[in-house]
């Protein structure tokens, strides 16, 4: 394992702007996305829960083989690379990408000596208005002080973003202090927390849910956690948004 040297991206929908209603699927796939059972589960999910955006954490991308997202444009924020694979965040969409920005944590996780990443992408409506999509995986296996410092670092980046925003991912907020730090992060960016149906399907650590969706400037039509029968150690959250 070593520091990533590339952040793959492919844009093939650059003439397709956001629609007034759009949907997303957020999922920590636990590096399971190359298994046939994952592809079968994803196909079934997308048939029942069509999604314009896929926000994956712990995505495993082969360097020299097809990766299974041929119908989507995508951007990746890698936090780890090996001879054959790249790992990290992946945001895929059937809409155009206006920009992307990648932020790696300064600190490394103690057990694996890897950093975590944040991927910020922007997607335009036809009139030029923009939605910022933030895909996050909060750092783990560090002190609370380091966790909090990394959140502040990301907050500073996002404070420069105006307009509509969705922040989603695995935040690793499994303690009272981490929950409070994330709540302060949410409030500082004027974000609302999505109320998720079937919340008991959300991944929990020490009985605390760690996968979340936050948003502003949009109407949340619905959000639902979906039981995928342990394809990953997390379940996906599907959400539908409308432009105000």
Residue ranges and their predicted role:
Residues 1-9, 51-130, 226-228:
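Structured beta-strand-rich core segments of catalytic domains in phosphoester-bond hydrolases
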Residues 1-23:
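Acidic, histidine-bearing metal-coordination/catalytic regions of metal-dependent phosphoesterases
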Residues 15, 21-39, 81, 108-112, ...:
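Acidic/histidine-rich helix-loop elements
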Residues 17-18, 92-95, 120-128, 215-216, ...:
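Active-site beta-strand termini and strand-to-loop segments that position acidic
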Residues 22-29, 42-65, 121, 132-136, ...:
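Active-site beta-strand/loop signature of hydrolases that rely on acidic residues for catalysis
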Residues 38, 75-93, 110-114, 173-238:
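Active site of divalent-metal-dependent phosphoester/diester hydrolases
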Residues 129-132, 136-143:
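Metal-dependent phosphoester/phosphodiester hydrolase catalytic core
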Residues 145-156:
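Alpha-helical scaffold elements lining the catalytic groove of polysaccharide deacetylases
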